[in-house]
A protein has these predicted regions:
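Kelch-like beta-propeller repeat domains
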Residues: 1-345
């Protein structure tokens, strides 16, 4: 990484050594360090510095979860009845620590329902969903910076959609499929450039796909299963794959289990084939969610409807054997997990 600093990063140290020290600084100290001086702040918040840390192996993976918040279901009249409120929980598997992020802008009580998460250049991106009071679709984009510990609003999605596939690659977030305000399944897609705060339309898929799931594998974005407007709930067994290099789609047959909802439970096995996290162990067969954290996977789910949500870690090398390690979870973070993603900070 080339630096153009006029003054030394750390007094009395060569610039290269000062950069090495900053690179090794744990992400949990970035917020305090960014307040030392403008030079440190600019460095810690720069995209080049993030990729420099990533190249040298000093980034850190955490799980970000859309999770039901205990005791908040009727807070300030935000909801009627017993419908849960959702917030964003962060779990660090290395330190076994939990925290809940501050609310996103415009929604002081809870997240938009069914919003989607993606990780992009060390930041957490929240898109779409339903207004938690009116249940109308929203097109909001929110970006969380783990250095400043603050949210900002991004440019809104060009069109409102729900239950779409989402994935990120090379500083961009891809949004494809889902359904519009009239519940028509979509085959359109858009890509959001985080640095430019701009949207660009993608070439369309071959068919419409509602409630599809997005997975980035290498240089490809897989949009798994889904169903058409006239086939509600009839989940397809194929997938469409977007090649980042060519910008073209291709269809892959027999990629998924026909009739099974793919939402948040699509994984990639050791052989590179798609798999369902729900098949790993009976303990997570209902509502299974999987988040890959490097060599580990965080699994959430329950053995049957109505039982408490359980949380596990599993080593990827043992994924086919289903050797689950139970996570001890504080009560305030034991709520139902709707979806999630890994953020490499």
């Amino acid at each position: 990484m080339e630096t153009t600093m006029v003054t030394e990063l750390i007094p009395s140290l060569p610039q290269e050594l000062g950069l090495e020290c900053m690179t090794r600084l744990p992400y949990t100290a970035h917020r305090v360090a960014s307040q030392v001086c403008k030079q440190w702040c600019d460095l810690l918040e720069s995209k080049d510095f993030y990729y420099h840390r990533k190249k040298l192996g000093y980034t850190h993976k955490v799980a970000c979860l859309v999770q039901a918040v205990h005791g908040a279901d009727v807070l300030q009249g935000s909801k009627q009845g017993n419908s849960p409120c959702f917030g964003i929980t962060v779990f660090d598997s290395a330190s076994q620590t939990w925290e809940r992020l501050d609310p996103v802008p415009n929604y002081p009580i809870e997240l938009p329902l069914f919003c989607q998460l993606a990780s992009c250049e060390g930041k957490l991106v929240v898109m779409g969903g339903w207004d938690p009071v009116s249940y109308e679709q929203v097109s909001h984009v929110f970006v969380y910076d783990f250095t400043t510990r603050k949210w900002r609003e991004g440019k809104e999605m060009p069109s409102k959609r729900s239950f779409f596939a989402i994935g990120s690659y090379s500083g961009r977030v891809y949004v494809v499929g889902g359904h519009d305000e009239n519940k028509n399944a979509l085959r359109t897609g858009w890509v959001y450039d985080l640095s430019k705060d701009e949207w660009t339309e993608l070439t369309q898929m071959n068919q419409e796909r509602d409630e599809c799931e997005g997975v980035v594998i290498g240089d490809e974005f897989w949009v798994v299963s889904g169903y058409g407007t006239d086939n509600q709930g009839a989940f397809e067994g194929d997938a469409e794959v977007y090649e980042f290099g060519s910008g073209q789609w291709r269809q892959v047959k027999k990629a998924w289990i026909p009739g099974r909802c793919p939402r948040s439970c699509v994984g990639v096995g050791k052989d590179g084939r798609l798999m369902s996290w729900a098949d790993l162990d009976p303990m997570v067969r209902a509502g299974a969610r999987g988040i890959t954290l490097g060599s580990q996977v965080m699994l959430t789910g329950l053995d049957n409807q109505g039982s408490p949500e359980e949380f596990y870690l599993i080593e990827m090398k043992d994924a086919q054997n289903g050797k689950l390690e139970k996570i001890i979870v504080p009560d305030e973070f034991s709520g139902f997990v709707q979806s999630g993603c890994c953020v490499e900070i």
